[in-house]
From Swiss-Prot:
Disulfide bonds: none annotated. Keywords: Electron transport, Heme, Iron, Metal-binding, Pyrrolidone carboxylic acid, Signal, Transport. The keyword Chaperone does not apply. Heme c binds at residues 35, 38-39, 120. The modification Pyrrolidone carboxylic acid is found at residue 21. It comes from the Bacteria. It comes from Paracoccus denitrificans. Binds 1 heme c group covalently per subunit. Residues 1-20 form the signal peptide. This is Cytochrome c-550. InterPro entries: Cyt_c-like_dom, Cyt_c-like_dom_sf, Cyt_c_1A/1B.
Length: 155
C-alpha cells in the first residue's frame, strides 16, 4: 500500500512540469485579467501588451528570468530570500504554476523557512497552466517569441 502511495505521489510530481507545457496561452490571456490588477506585461521598448497595475512586477519575460530580478521593483522579504539562497535560479513554467497556486508554500519550500512571507496574497485555484503558457509566450528567453510585443498589440 505504501509503495502505491509513493508511486502516485512521484507520478504527480513528475507530471507537474508537463502540465505547464499543456497550458493554452489564448485561455491564459483571458485568465490574466485576474492578474492585471497588480501586474502588467510591458515589452522592453515600452509597448504595453497588457496594461495593468504596478503593485506586482512587470511579467514580460518572467519565464526564464532570474527570481526577484525585475529592475526597480521592490520585492518582499520571502522572494528576496529565495533569490539570495539560489542566485542562479530562474522562473520555470513549473515553478510559476506552483507559485501562482499558492505563493507561501513555494516560498517555504525554496527557503526552508516556515516563517517566509510573501507580498502576493492572491491564490489561483485553476487555469494556472494556461496563464503560465501565456506568460511563456511573452518571455523570449523561455522560447516565447514575444509575438504580441512585436506586433504592437495593446490591451
Amino acid at each position: 500500500m505504501k509503495i502505491s502511495i509513493y508511486a502516485t505521489l512521484a507520478a504527480i510530481t513528475l507530471a507537474l512540469p508537463a502540465a505547464a507545457q499543456d497550458g493554452d496561452a489564448a485561455k491564459g490571456e483571458k485568465e490574466f485579467n485576474k492578474c492585471k490588477a497588480c501586474h502588467m506585461i510591458q515589452a522592453p521598448d515600452g509597448t504595453d501588451i497588457i496594461k495593468g497595475g504596478k503593485t506586482g512586477p512587470n511579467l514580460y519575460g518572467v519565464v526564464g528570468r532570474k527570481i526577484a530580478s525585475e529592475e526597480g521593483f521592490k520585492y518582499g522579504e520571502g522572494i528576496l530570500e529565495v533569490a539570495e539562497k539560489n542566485p542562479d535560479l530562474t522562473w520555470t513554467e513549473a515553478d510559476l504554476i506552483e507559485y501562482v497556486t499558492d505563493p507561501k508554500p513555494w516560498l517555504v519550500k525554496m527557503t526552508d523557512d516556515k516563517g517566509a512571507k510573501t507580498k502576493m496574497t492572491f491564490k489561483m485555484g485553476k487555469n494556472q497552466a494556461d496563464v503560465v503558457a501565456f506568460l511563456a509566450q511573452n518571455s523570449p528567453d523561455a522560447g516565447g517569441d514575444g509575438e504580441a510585443a512585436a506586433e504592437g498589440e495593446s490591451n
